[in-house]
Amino acid sequence: VTYYEESEKNVLRHIGYHRIEGFLQDSWKLAPRLTVDGGVRVAWIGPADDLEGRGIVVWDKARYDPQAPPSAVSGMTWHAIDPSVPTTGVRMPVFVTPRVGFAWDVAGTGVTVVRGGFGVYRYPDAPQFYGSMIDLAYGVRYFSTCCATSLRELEGLGTGEVIFGGQAVDKADDQQPRTLSWSLTLDRKLPWSTSLEIGYVGSKSDHQMNWWLDQYNAVPLGAMLDDPFGDANDYRPLPNYGNLYINRHSAYQNYHALQALLSRQRGRVNFTAAYTFSKNLGLKGADYNGYRANASEYAFDPREYNYGVLGTDRTHVASLSWSLQLPDVKRGGAWRALLGNWQLAGVSSYVSGAPLMGSFGIQGTTAGGAPISNEAITGSPDVYAMPVLVCDPRDSVPDGYLFNPACFTAPLPGANGSARQPYIKGQPYHNHDLSLAKNVPIGKGRRRLQIRVSAYNVFNHPIRFPDTTRNLTLVFDNGVQTNADFGKLPDDNKYGRRIVQLSARFEF
C-alpha cells in the first residue's frame, strides 16, 4: 500500500453567484464621414458563493502556525467560524469597463470605410469549479497514510493523520476575469459587386483563474533526488499539509490575428472566402492540450515554465463557401423543364493542426537505470520529467511521421529537459462538401419542389489522429528509446467518411 485516502462524508455543493450591472452608451456623428460610439458598464460581479451558508474556505497566510497539528488546518478560515469572512470567502470591488468604437467613411462615398474599437469586459468563473472549496467548512476530513510494502508494515501504520489536502481561495484575491479586446478593419467595395474586408484583431485576457497551476505546497526542485520513492509530504514547505491548492486570479493569455474576408452576395454567383492567421499565447494552466512544465505558479516562475503557445492555437484557418445558379435554358418545353433551375453549391475548409506538446508522455529508465519519474528526474512530484532535445524535431521529419523522433532523448536525475518545447503540430483538418439542387416550379405563384443531393466530405478524405499511448509516448529502456511508433501518424486510427444525402422540399 503506497497511499490510502478516505473522506468521511458527502456535502451538498450548492454554489452560485450574484451579479448587478448597469450601463450607459451613446453615438455621436462628429463629422459627416465620422461616427463614434462610446459607453461604459458598471458591474458588481460577486465571487462564487456557498448558498447553504457555511462559506467558501479561505487561505489566510497570516493565520498559519507551523507548530499547529495538521487537524487544526492552520491558516484556513470560513464564514461559519469567523463571521467577518463573507460566505463568498473574498470580497469584490465594483468594476468599471469602458468601450469605444468608430467608423470613418474615407471619401464619403461608402466605397472605403475604416472601423475600429476597444473594449473591456468582465465576467465570472463557472461556479461548479468551486464545489470542493466548501468541503472543509462542512466537516469533511481525509484519512491519509503512506507507505507500506508488506503486511507487517501495514499493521504498524496506526490510524493515520486527519489532514486537509484540498482547495481554498486566496484571501488577497479581489479580481474577476477580464478581457481587453481591440480591432482595426478596412472595408473596401470592389468591382463585380464584391467587397473586401481586412483587419487586425487582438485581445488580452488577464485575472484568469490559476487552475492546474495552483499547487501552493509544492515540493522544491531537487528535494527528492536522493529519495525518489519517499513520501513527498516529508519535503513540502508546509509540513502539516499535503497537496494544497490555493486559487487566485493570476493567469493570463493573449491573441493576435490578421483576418480577411472576400465576398459577393448578388446575382447567380455568390461566394464568401475567409482567412485568419493568428497566434494564441498564455500560461498553460487549465488550457486543454497545453504543455505544463509544473503544477505551481507559487514555487516556480510561471513565465519560464508555463508560458507559450496554447492548446487552442490554430495558425491558419481558411474557408470558402459558394453557390452557382446555372444559366437558364432559352428553349422552352421539356428542355427548359429538364435543364433549367439547377443550383450548385459547396463549402471547403482548412484548419492547421492542433499543438501536440501537451499530449506527450514519458516512461521507462534512464541510461543509468534510474526510473523516469518526476521525483527521480526533477526531485519534485510537482515538476514534470521532460525529454532532452538534441535537435529540432520539426526538421528532417521522416515520411509518415508528425515530427522527428530521433531528436528526443532520455533525461537524467538532476538534468531534466527544457520546459520550453518546440511548437509541434498535429495533422491539419480539411474538408469539402458539395450539393446539387433542382428547383421544379409547380403551377403559378411561388410553389416549387426542390430536389437536392448533398455529399459531405465529397472526396472521402479521412483525418488520421495519433494515439496518445502508442504514438505520443516515449518509452526508454536504459536510455534507449524503444517505441518504434513514437511520432508516427498511424494508418489505422482515422476518422471521417463520405456521407451522401438525398432530400426533397416543397415550398409554397
Each language-model region and where it sits:
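Surface-exposed patches in mature extracellular/periplasmic domains of secreted proteins
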Residues: 37, 111-115, 332-335
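Generic hydrophobic alpha-helical membrane-span motif
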Residues: 37-38, 125, 463
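Signature of Gram-negative outer-membrane beta-barrel scaffolds
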Residues: 1-107, 290-293
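Hydrophobic alpha-helical segments
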Residues: 23, 36, 113-114, 343, ...
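Short, solvent-exposed micro-motifs at the edges of structured domains
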Residues: 16, 33, 45-47, 163-167, ...
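Solvent-exposed loop/turn elements at secondary-structure boundaries
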Residues: 53-247, 371, 406, 427
